[in-house]
Curated annotation (Swiss-Prot):
The gene is murC. This is UDP-N-acetylmuramate--L-alanine ligase. Pathway: Cell wall biogenesis; peptidoglycan biosynthesis. Keywords: ATP-binding, Cell cycle, Cell division, Cell shape, Cell wall biogenesis/degradation, Cytoplasm, Ligase, Nucleotide-binding, Peptidoglycan synthesis. InterPro entries: Mur-like_cat_sf (IPR036565), Mur_ligase_C (IPR004101), Mur_ligase_C_dom_sf (IPR036615), Mur_ligase_cen (IPR013221), Mur_ligase_N (IPR000713), MurCDEF_pg_biosynth (IPR050061), UDP-N-AcMur_Ala_ligase_MurC (IPR005758). Its EC number is 6.3.2.8.
């Protein structure tokens, strides 16, 4: 249980979720510190900026439950020296999800779950609500902020290993249920059942994408509102105008026109995410004029269609690693850069996902102007497999395998948009390429 009279000690404080949570608690006035590996990570920058102490793993860091509340990262087991110290000293710990749930219960809370679009939607919702009321947020890309006396707490709810079932929010946005994490979930039914339980644990209302049949099949005792492009949706985006600077559209709430909204984001998925955000705000009686202003100042989420320009070459960094996400990112790139050559550098993420979606990946990459595939990114829980990047390239005409030693091949593309896609360490490929521009 969180306690402002004790130190909150994070075992694994540099993890993206853990770093975000540490920042939230620090902002809310808790005494936060923690430990992790020595290797530099991007998440330690905001921790250092906030003055949060980060030490190496050491059994001496573990005191007693009278002095500390221990928050243990999900990845750390008994072979970690601090976890071992907790066991030796009979010091109890709590998990990341259980700690987040304590914050969920302190505020009007909105969770964002779904296979795709969680980070983008959470970021947008936190930004828009934060423009009109004190809002704390926790985002899966390493960002978190606590605001004293917050009205809202907006957080990303990750379904992996059913972590999001620790939460009981007031509202929940569910973007889609598209089978993922085949290393953990047995099949689609097993995956969908986790979302059914999450829906059961939501208190006031559920907001779901109207085109997703699995979301439609969820049973709930609370209102379940749909959002999308169809006349049957409770919150419908209409009169859509797409340009190279973004999109404009009206939103109807149960047939009532809430006005015209503008976003500097691209692709149908961005319009859908925005409509979900508008639906939540409308339900909480947030003035629509305030929402319109907030949308205009939103710059986008980290590693979600993040753009840099180098003369006639635009470089996009995107977290897409599932077929649905890849299609959305490619659609967004075509909307913003209709006259440029579309070059995709794709890093497959985990062997099990690559095997499961091999045909989808190949189909998607056959549809771009030029495709490059890096070696498969192996996760800590899955170091090898019976598929390789060469297997994909062999089925994609004109594509090539690319690695750091031949990254210079990308420089032959002029008047191009080069999209780096992946959830692993693909930024190292992007960095190497940008140094050559």
């Amino acid at each position: 249980m969180l306690d402002k009279n004790k130190q909150i000690w994070f075992i694994g404080i540099k993890g993206t979720g853990m770093a975000s949570l540490a920042l939230v608690l620090h902002d809310l006035g808790y005494n936060v510190a923690g430990s992790d590996i020595e290797k530099y990570t991007f998440t330690q920058v905001p921790l250092e900026k906030a003055g949060i102490e980060v030490k190496d793993f050491d059994p001496a860091n573990i005191k007693s439950n009278d002095e500390q509340v221990i928050v243990k990262g999900n990845a750390f087991k008994q072979d970690n020296p601090e976890v071992a110290a907790c066991l030796d000293k009979n010091v109890e710990w709590q998990s990341y999800p259980d700690t987040v749930e304590e914050i969920v219960q302190m505020h009007t809370s909105i969770g964002v779950s779904g296979t795709h679009g969680k980070t983008s939607t959470t970021s947008l919702l936190a930004h828009v609500l934060g423009e009109v009321a004190p809002t704390s947020y926790l985002i899966g890309d390493g960002r978190g902020k606590g605001v004293a006396d917050s009205r809202f707490f907006v957080y990303e709810a990750d379904e992996y290993r059913r972590h999001f079932l620790a939460y009981h929010p007031d509202y929940q946005i569910m973007t889609n249920i598209d089978f993922d994490h085949p290393d953990y979930f047995k099949d689609q039914d097993d995956y969908t059942s986790a979302f059914q339980t999450a829906a059961d644990q939501t208190k006031k209302a559920l907001f779901v994408w109207g085109d997703d049949k699995r979301l439609q099949s969820l049973k709930t005792d609370i209102p379940k509102y749909t959002y999308g492009f169809k006349d049957t949706d409770d919150f419908q985006a209409v009169n859509i105008e797409k340009t190279t600077t973004g999109s404009k559209f009206n939103v109807l709430a149960h047939g009532k026109d809430l006005g015209r909204f503008e976003i500097h984001l691209f692709g149908d998925h961005s319009i859908l995410n925005t409509t979900a955000v508008i639906a939540v705000a409308y339900t909480e009686k947030v003035p629509m004029e305030d929402i319109k202003e907030g949308l205009l100042t939103f710059k986008g989420a980290k590693r979600r269609f993040a753009e840099k320009d180098f003369g006639d070459v635009s470089v996009i960094d995107d977290y897409a690693h599932h077929p649905t996400e890849m299609r959305a990112t490619i659609q967004a790139a075509r909307q913003k850069f209709p006259d440029k050559e579309l070059v995709v550098v794709f890093q497959p993420h985990t062997f099990s996902r690559t095997k499961k979606y091999q045909k989808d990946f190949e189909e998607i990459l056959r549809d771009v102007d030029k495709a490059y595939v890096t070696p498969i990114y192996a996760s800590a829980r899955e170091a090898s497999g019976d598929i390789s990047s060469e297997d994909l390239v062999n089925n994609i005409p004109g594509s090539e395998v690319i690695d750091l030693d031949n990254i210079a091949d990308l420089t032959k593309h002029k008047n191009a948009v080069v999209v780096f896609m992946g959830a692993g360490d693909i930024p190292k490929y992007e960095d190497a390429y940008e140094k050559l521009l």
